[in-house]
Amino acid sequence: IREEQPYQEISEHDTPKPNTAYGKSKLEAERYLDSIGNNFPYIILRPTGVYGPREKDYFLMAQSIKQHVDFAVGFKRQDITFVYVQDVVQAVFLALDHGMNGRKYFLSDGEVYQSAAFSDLIKKELGNPRMLRIKAPVWVLRIVTFFGEYLGRMTGKMSALNNDKYNILKQRNWRCDIEPAMDELGYHPHYPLERGVKLAIKWYKDNGWL
């Protein structure tokens, strides 16, 4: 959605076009709730890239950087948004108290980042190890994830590099409109990316993940 530059924020009024199995399953759940009508009260939260303790996808990035490699995909501008898990928890409780029935609220930390921002902060928290930053064309990722998906089906173990991961990484616009969450729920993110990454990396270290 809204992949043309200059990128615009995605709002609840845009027609969802999920490109992963996970995203499609969430949309099916939303449509089911919408079909019930007002007889069943519900509120939908749509957090963007959630990170924090126990999260595994961003942990793999941290692990790779610790091993001196950072991998990025695509040469077209990519605007990314994130939300720390504690801010998601805050939004859940606020939605229970103040959310409007049937509404859909996007969640992020309110900022927009370029693709290298997250890995640069991870590198800083790891003590600035030497790092080789590799940026590959999208078609290279397509080949890698194709074989990752194939091997996962053959072995019965899902590869981290699969078709869903390809669709996530190739998307360029992750901007989202959090104004409704702020205005109606009283949501105010407390964890900017630098603080959140610091806490996440500390947890990974303290718990033996890194």
Where are these predicted regions, by residue range?
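Conserved sequence/active-site signature of Rossmann-fold short-chain dehydrogenase/reductase
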Residues: 1, 50-52, 88
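Catalytic helix-loop patch of NAD(P)-dependent Rossmann-fold dehydrogenases
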Residues: 4-50, 70-74
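A short C-terminal helix-loop "cap" of Rossmann-like NAD(P)-dependent dehydrogenase/epimerase domains
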Residues: 12-15, 62-73, 128, 154-160, ...
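Residue-level signal for the nucleotide or nucleotide-sugar donor/cofactor binding architecture
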Residues: 20, 80-86, 113, 176, ...
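Substrate-positioning beta->alpha
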Residues: 24, 28-29, 55-60, 73-96, ...
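Conserved C-terminal active-site "lid" loop/helix of NAD(P)H-dependent oxidoreductases
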Residues: 85, 120, 145-188
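Mid/C-terminal beta-alpha module of Rossmann-like enzyme folds, strongest
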Residues: 95-161, 194, 198-201
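Amphipathic terminal alpha-helices
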Residues: 176-184, 188-210
